[in-house]
Amino acid sequence: MNQTNLDFLATSDPALAAIIDRELQRQRTHIELIASENFTSAAVMAAQGSVLTNKYAEGLPGKRYYGGCEFVDQAETLAISRVKELFGAAHANVQPHSGAQANFAVFLTLLQPGDTIMGMDLSHGGHLTHGSPVNVSGKWFEVAHYGVEKETGRLDYDKIRQQALEVKPKLLICGYSAYPRQIEFDKFRAIADEVGAYLMADIAHIAGLVASGHHPSPLPYCDVVTTTTHKTLRGPRGGLIMTNNEELGKKFDKSVFPGTQGGPLEHVITAKAVAFGEALKPEFKVYSGQVIANAQAMADQLQKRGFDLVSGGTDNHLMLVDLRSIAMTGKVGDQLLGEINITANKNTVPFDPESPFVTSGLRLGSPAMTTRGMQEDEFRTIANIIADRLLSPEDEGVKADCLRRVSELCAGFPLYDHLRIPVAVIA
């Protein structure tokens, strides 16, 4: 029998092997609704755990500072060509270690300390790296934040335009971590042109939907597009920069290395190449469409059970549930769902009176459980389980019944059946 990496780990470090086994069991037995999480394929994990982890390769393919890079050059070149085809981009850099690193490289290219950036407020669904005061982006640059409308939970592009005319940002940022509606990139382009700003789209959450044609692409409109490679794209954890401007692309390359990073993680880049190849297949388009259908089914059922959703629903993979109508905080809701093996995350809602550590909302997403094969009926069932638990938080009988239903759902949609950690060794 051929030994696997997990066999070696169980022999050499049984304590860590046991931890990994417990995490595997958690993933198998829990309903995963964190919108930024997904389950990668076995092929992605195999690439990331390969011998490419041993290779240093500062620079770009064909222009390395180390010898012996001929094969990692091939892998990285394949990742670049695949992602360019996937998104229709003229230029791509696959080296950023994360979405935040990709954003920092863009800032280094386009901005000087003290320049003004304009992005969505974190409490309205933006991201830390879009100018939050606790992040480097909020410390190095002047920041103007826009948000959604209180009545609709949606962007008002006329108001964003008026704000941009007043503050005249050098960089206008669109793309969010908790906005459940489609983004109109053409309207942002018009605003950026009017004020003379660069336009950046951070599509970390919707990248898979964009790649599969289920969300409009920002590339025809934006000077630069950044993203993570996990979430809806279902690859390894990492970042990516794309542009249709070749001259800017060369500058972004220099801002990644040597500007913000040293050696690239070639094992992760190879895993990205695997994921990009998977996303180019017809099955991925079907998957992405199902992600949206499942999110909408869950959102509709939650509304039927009396829950308020920010903006009244969703166009993508996520939704924000405002728990103020049932006098519950996001922190409590998160804990209650955790007790029945549903993993979600507390999240601020627009105009939230609670602190970010408490919040008034829950963010729920469909990508991970869609990967496990669940469809609309299962997501309506999940919505009912959530409603039953949150509407009867003190009822131990309801809690036990919810836990049973979660267990049955997970058992019907197995995860990583091929993975085996030799428990005899780690016991």
Curated annotation (Swiss-Prot):
Primary site of residence: cytoplasm
InterPro entries: PyrdxlP-dep_Trfase, PyrdxlP-dep_Trfase_major, PyrdxlP-dep_Trfase_small, Ser_HO-MeTrfase, Ser_HO-MeTrfase-like, Ser_HO-MeTrfase_PLP_BS, SHMT-like_dom
EC number(s) from the headed UniProt entry: 2.1.2.1
Keyword Acyltransferase on entry: no
Family the entry assigns: Belongs to the SHMT family.
Complex and partners: Homodimer.
Protein name: Serine hydroxymethyltransferase
